[in-house]
């Protein structure tokens, strides 16, 4: 929200310690921390409505993370609201609230709103973090996400991921199927369509910033175009006409290059394109199918899947195509690798066969080839689970999940999220069927 939402005050009071232990979200499942998000004080009716809505969004963000348990306002004892008083901590401890959020909303002469909040530790009776934001009314939801991000970061030690966007493919349930690129907040709010559904579209990807996306469009069965769309202006342009491409490019961390797979002469290989010159550089060779490339966060490595040894497995190579190393060694076929923004893990889809037929799995493994022979961990499975992508803090994975048709109901596809630990799986609500999610970085 840079240039739109800015922080006037970074810290209202200095705090050096607090009673709550920092939540480590890699160490299995822990009981959610009980938190009370109190009613925000408001100086007029418009501010009161805004404050009420913000409390709901903040509470929902924290609840969806699986790390916090918002306490019902019906059990609150203390009636005071706002940030200008010290809470009656005993009253909050009585309802088992370890954390307390107080806030206030004021309407300014400019028409904007000043939003303040304080996070309290009720056990030590200390403030943990507090800030003041100034926002136009239409960005109140982003302000709420920003506050939830600050709370999440203070308690977990990791950056929050609530002020983010998801781009995905929306698919109508009626025949003929209509696929459109859609954009929404990370929690499913503010859904809007970016394409008109007149052509087949696939695999939307964010550019280095969240201001632009790229996607594949089938103008005809033989003509496949990669489009760039500016989300601020709505303008769209063709990046290139790439016969044989099946997935949109993934972009290097510096935004200067992108990698993609292109099928030619019976083989599919990884190519890197210089976005300034549009020149292609082939990175893989030999026979076989090499697809789904993804850069490491520092841009020096690329992970991809290849069937060069008969069964699709995952490989890592330098960004110039050298030093190829296999990193997957389990049974089954591997696909769709995605490198964590933190650089520590790679998420993937894995297809295994059993007596009941095929099972799709989403898993993670360590990104270091020397460490990953025994590091693979499956975090969810189903009839169809695919297309994993990471939250910007590398601690949540979003993916597409499908169900088959039956005599009672048609098949469907939805978007889900799950924690790195394999817990807290939840659906991200969309107006229609959805697939191919891609998570933006935290918005400016």
UniProtKB/Swiss-Prot annotation:
NCBIfam families given in the database record: propeller_TolB (TIGR02800)
Sorted UniProt keywords: Cell cycle, Cell division, Periplasm, Signal
Gene Ontology CC terms: periplasmic space
InterPro entries: 6-blade_b-propeller_TolB-like, PD40, Tol-Pal_TolB, TolB_N
Entry-linked Pfam families: PD40 (PF07676), TolB_N (PF04052)
Phylogenetic lineage: Bacteria, Pseudomonadati, Pseudomonadota, Alphaproteobacteria, Rickettsiales
Keyword match Ribonucleoprotein: no
PANTHER family: PROTEIN TOLB, PROTEIN TOLB HOMOLOG
Domain of life: Bacteria
Location(s) in or outside the cell: Periplasm
Cystine bridges: none
Gene Ontology process terms (BP): cell division; protein import
Quaternary state and interactors: The Tol-Pal system is composed of five core proteins: the inner membrane proteins TolA, TolQ and TolR, the periplasmic protein TolB and the outer membrane protein Pal. They form a network linking the inner and outer membranes and the peptidoglycan layer.
SUPFAM superfamilies for the chain: TolB, N-terminal domain (SSF52964), Tricorn protease N-terminal domain (SSF69304)
Family: Belongs to the TolB family.
Signal peptide positions (record): 1-19
Protein name: Tol-Pal system protein TolB
Function field: Part of the Tol-Pal system, which plays a role in outer membrane invagination during cell division and is important for maintaining outer membrane integrity.
């Amino acid at each position: 929200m840079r240039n739109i939402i800015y922080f006037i005050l970074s810290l209202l009071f200095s705090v050096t310690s607090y009673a709550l232990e920092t939540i480590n979200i890699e160490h299995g499942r822990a009981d959610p921390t009980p938190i009370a998000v109190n009613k925000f004080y408001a100086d007029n009716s418009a501010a009161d409505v805004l404050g009420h809505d913000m409390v709901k969004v903040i509470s929902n963000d924290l609840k969806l993370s699986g790390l916090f348990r918002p306490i019902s306002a019906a059990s609150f004892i203390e009636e005071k609201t706002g940030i200008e008083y010290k809470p009656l901590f005993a009253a909050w401890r009585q309802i088992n609230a370890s954390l307390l959020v107080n806030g206030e909303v004021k309407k300014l002469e400019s028409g904007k709103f000043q939003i303040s909040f304080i996070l309290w530790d009720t056990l030590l009776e200390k403030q943990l973090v507090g800030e003041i934001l100034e926002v136009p009314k239409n960005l109140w939801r982003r302000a709420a996400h920003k506050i939830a991000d600050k709370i999440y970061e203070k308690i977990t030690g990791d950056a929050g991921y609530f002020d983010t966007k998801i781009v995905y493919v929306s698919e109508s349930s009626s025949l003929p199927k209509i696929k459109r690129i859609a954009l929404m907040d990370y929690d499913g709010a503010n859904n809007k369509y970016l394409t008109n559904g007149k052509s087949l579209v696939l695999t939307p990807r964010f550019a280095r910033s969240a201001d632009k996306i790229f996607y594949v469009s089938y103008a005809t069965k033989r003509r496949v175009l990669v489009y760039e769309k500016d989300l601020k202006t709505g303008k769209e342009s063709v990046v290139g006409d790439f016969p044989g491409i099946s997935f949109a490019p993934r972009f290097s961390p510096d935004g200067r290059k992108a990698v993609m797979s292109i099928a030619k002469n019976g083989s599919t290989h990884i190519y890197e394109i210089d976005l300034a010159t549009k020149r292609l550089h082939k990175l893989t060779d030999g026979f076989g199918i090499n697809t789904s490339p993804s850069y490491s966060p520092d841009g020096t490595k690329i992970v991809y899947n290849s069937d060069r040894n008969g069964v699709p497995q995952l490989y890592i190579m330098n960004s110039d195509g050298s030093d190829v190393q296999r990193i997957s060694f389990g049974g089954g076929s591997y696909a769709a690798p995605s490198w964590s923004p933190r650089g520590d893990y790679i998420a993937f889809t894995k297809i295994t066969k059993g007596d009941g037929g095929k099972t799709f799995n989403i898993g993670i493994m360590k990104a270091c080839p020397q460490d990953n022979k025994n590091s693979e961990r499956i975090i969810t499975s189903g009839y169809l689970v695919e297309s994993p992508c990471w939250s910007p803090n590398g601690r949540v994975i979003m993916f597409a999940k499908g169900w088959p048709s039956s005599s009672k109901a048609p098949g469907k596809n939805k978007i889900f999220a799950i924690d790195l630990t394999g817990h807290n799986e939840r659906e991200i609500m969309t107006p229609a069927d959805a697939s191919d999610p891609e998570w933006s970085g935290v918005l400016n």
